């Protein structure tokens, strides 16, 4: 199984998940193994979101930069998915006006398109809200499976 990680998953891991202790280190090792064998990926827009979020000299940004190869660019197939997705007015709401005005990255649609083309499961902390353009709603629109941070941590823990 391939997992596509949302920015909020990286931020939870990097900002809150301990780096020391046998059980914690095993989870970090499982994460790095998944990144190395390409079963854990993300998109370049997530990388850009985190580069904007963390200070240039932070340990978290250094960790991300050391794993830059996991942040994939969109393919032609994904671009076609995005084109069709954004024909729907409700889905256009997934890109917030403030992101457009401030030239800030917005990864949600790219994440779902990546998961769709890889037949992967998207991992996010966002919760489904009816009539919304949250990540779970975009997943529903494109018939993409998604799981929570807790579900993903359980999977990583079982691999360690």
Residue map of PLM features:
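Acidic, metal-associated active-site segment
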Residues: 102-122, 134, 138
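Acidic, PIN/NYN-like endoribonuclease modules and their adjacent C-terminal/linker elements
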Residues: 2, 121, 127-160
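Acidic, metal-coordinating catalytic cores used for nucleic-acid/nucleotide bond scission
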Residues: 49-54, 104, 126-131
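Short, well-structured N-terminal submotif of metal-dependent ribonuclease cores
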Residues: 1-42, 51-64
């Amino acid at each position: 199984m391939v997992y596509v990680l949302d920015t909020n998953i990286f931020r939870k891991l990097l900002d809150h998940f301990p780096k020391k202790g046998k059980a914690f280190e095993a989870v970090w090792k499982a994460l790095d193994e998944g990144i190395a064998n390409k079963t854990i990926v993300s998109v370049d827009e997530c990388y850009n979101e985190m580069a904007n979020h963390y200070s240039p000299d932070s340990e978290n940004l250094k960790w991300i930069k050391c794993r830059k190869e996991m942040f994939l660019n969109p393919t032609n197939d994904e671009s076609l998915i995005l084109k069709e997705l954004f024909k729907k007015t409700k889905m256009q709401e997934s890109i917030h006006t403030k992101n457009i005005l401030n030239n800030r990255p917005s990864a949600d649609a790219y994440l779902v398109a990546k998961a769709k083309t890889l037949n992967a499961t998207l991992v996010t902390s966002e919760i489904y809200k009816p009539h919304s353009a949250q990540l779970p709603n975009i997943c529903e629109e494109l018939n993409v499976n998604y799981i929570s941070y807790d579900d993903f941590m359980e999977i990583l823990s079982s691999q360690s």
